[in-house]
Structure formats: structure tokens, C-alpha cells
Amino acid sequence: MYLDAIIIGAGFSGLYQLHKCRDQLGLKTLVIEEGKEVGGTWYWNKYPGSRCDTESHIYCYTFSEEIYKNWKWKERYPKQKEILSYLKYVERKLSLRKDIIFNNKVISADYLDKKNLWRVKTDKKKVFYCKYLISAVGSLSAANIPSIKGIKSFKGEWYHSGRWPDKKISFKNQKVAQIGTGSSGIQIAPVVAKSAKSLTVFQRTPNYSVPARNRKLTKTFIKNTKESYKQIKNLLTKTPGGHAFKFSKKSIFDFNESKRLKILEKAWLNGGLSFRACF
């Protein structure tokens, strides 16, 4: 099958690239997705406590004012299920599914110099040819399954945050061991601890985290963000990481200790990533 463009992955980036290539550039485009649904990171990472650490009103597409204003987020930091629902909404809104094939993992991509084409093969023995190949696999979807001695002979249940099963897992009255305290580990531990008989966390490197101060979004906040669509979109292009808060140009040493503590305390109470933008 010959196409103008092939996109690998149906997450945030892949869906946007499909819209861009197909709807705006008029290219015959196909998305190849390993999973059985759109979502990318938010399809694979469905472990207990999984949610975004970026505020919902900016963790979304801004290319469409209609989509931005029609979707209503529930929380400051949305859960995995809410983000997945959002991406499914966008997929339906833009009629993207008809140009996505699921349950196909790209296993090779070779550039054929004489034909000036890419040859893309999947694990289902499908072969495609295209002029443009776009990788939208991201960096948070490939699970790193550690080679732990004895894991194959372990008699109990074990799970990986990046490949969490669809079925509901109960930790009630269970002795649980958790390995790792990265972003996923920090989110998983407090949820598991609520029902487990005991929870032991194995940590190699301590991480620093700030409080999220998560909360339900008020009608006033939702109304204000939608009315400020253009201003928010403009601000996102001018800040590191695309966040809707400005980074201070001042050094921490430009203030005395009393002033420094006041600035930090204010950011701490506000919660979230803006803490790192104080200085």
C-alpha cells in the first residue's frame, strides 16, 4: 500500500500530525498504532493514581478554538481516564479513526534510496510504502521491564506501571512491594497504601516533589480560561515547556532571605510546576 505519509503512534502528537497532514496538507496519511485504542501514553499508563502533572486547561490542543472551548475539564490535574476520554473526543470530532490501524506494531522502517520511499513493516506482516515517515511514539509509552533475578519463578502477582492490565487489581489485605519512586511510583504508592496490608517501597534515588494542590475546577475558572483562549495560546509559545505561567528573570540571590521565603511559600501553597519558575 502506497501513501504520502505514515505516522507511528496515536497519542497526542500522532493525532495532531494526522490532522495536519491529512486535513491541512491534503496528504494521503495513515497512523499505525500498537495499542487497540488512541491515547498513546494515556492508553498504556493506566496504573493506580495515574494523572497529569500539567494543568488541564493547557494540557490539551490549542490549534482548534472550537475543541478548546467545547471540552470541559473536571480537575486541575486530570486523571488518566479523563485525558483518554479527551483524546477520544478529539478523534471523533476530527474523524481520525478511519485513517488509523490499531494492534499493529512497527518492527522496521527502511529507506529505499532508488525509490525515494520508506518501507514500513508491522508485526502483523503488513507492508506500507510512503514518502514521509513521522515517528510520534513519544518517550513514556515503552515499558522498561527490569531483569530482576527470580522474577520468573516468583509465585505472587506482579505488575508493571507501563503495562497495567485492564482488569481491576485489588490490593486489599495484601503485602505489596514497590520498586522505584519516579513520577509513576510517587503516584502509585499513596493509592496502594490505602488498601494494602503493608507497602514497602524500594528506592534507589530520592526525588524531590512539590504538592499538586489538585482540586475540582470551578465554573468561574472554566469560563475564564475559555474566554482567555487566545491569550493562553499566545503565552504557551513564549514560556519554557509551554506552561501558562511566566518564569521569573530574577535570581534567588537578588532577594534577601525573608523575601525569598515569601516567594517560595506562595508558590508552594499554589502547588504544581510553577514552583520552579520562582527564580
What are these regions (language model features)?
Residues I100-I101, G156-Y159:
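Conserved beta-strand scaffold positions in the cores of enzyme catalytic domains, especially
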Residues M1-L3, Y159-N173:
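A short, basic/flexible loop-to-alpha-helix module at the beginning of a structural domain
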